């Protein structure tokens, strides 16, 4: 079923131009590039890697490759799964630029856009890296889905290059994932 649906997606997007694909990828799409990379890994068929690359949003990727943070105002949980896909593709293709883009994103979000509990957005969007006022003043706290996806990215990065990510892997689930579910 997974392969059939992937083939279906390849078929229905085959007539789209590169610009049309990039326009479509502005919307939240759940990290399809990662899924298609997984299908490539499962099947050994490189056509799925090409599909994964085609579903990679260049507006986010290209600045990350050159170490530029353009995240302010972006819908956070739309971007994180895209980056997970970049990392998955990088791992399968040994693409150092895409790997570095994922690492730069992680470092930027963790070290410049997150608060101590691990949250990194308010009202689902990245705040300015130099102004955390919205995170302190807004009644809506960080999204747990962002935190979950950042944990997934952390795990992927840690598996290929163990770093100082261990405190994030061990502490953030308790401060951001489990805490909102305590009804006492």
Question: Model-predicted segments: where are they?
Answer:
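Glycan-recognition and catalytic cores of secretory/periplasmic carbohydrate-active enzymes
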Residues: 1-184
């Amino acid at each position: 079923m997974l392969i059939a649906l992937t083939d279906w997606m390849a078929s229905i997007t085959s007539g789209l131009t590169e610009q049309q694909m990039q326009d479509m990828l502005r919307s939240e799409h759940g990290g399809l590039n990662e899924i298609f990379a997984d299908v490539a890994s499962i099947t050994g068929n490189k056509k799925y890697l090409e599909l994964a690359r085609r579903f990679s949003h260049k507006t986010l990727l290209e600045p990350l490759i050159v170490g530029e943070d353009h995240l302010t105002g972006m819908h956070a949980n739309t971007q994180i799964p895209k980056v997970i896909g970049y990392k998955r593709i990088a791992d399968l293709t040994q693409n150092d630029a895409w790997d570095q883009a994922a690492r730069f994103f992680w470092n930027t979000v963790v070290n410049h856009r997150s608060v101590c509990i691990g949250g990194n957005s308010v009202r689902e969007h990245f705040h300015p890296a130099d102004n955390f006022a919205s995170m302190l003043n807004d009644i809506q706290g960080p999204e747990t889905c962002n935190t979950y996806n950042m944990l997934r990215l952390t795990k992927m990065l840690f598996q290929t290059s163990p770093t100082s990510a261990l405190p994030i892997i061990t502490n953030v689930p308790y401060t951001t994932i489990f805490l909102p579910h305590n009804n006492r």
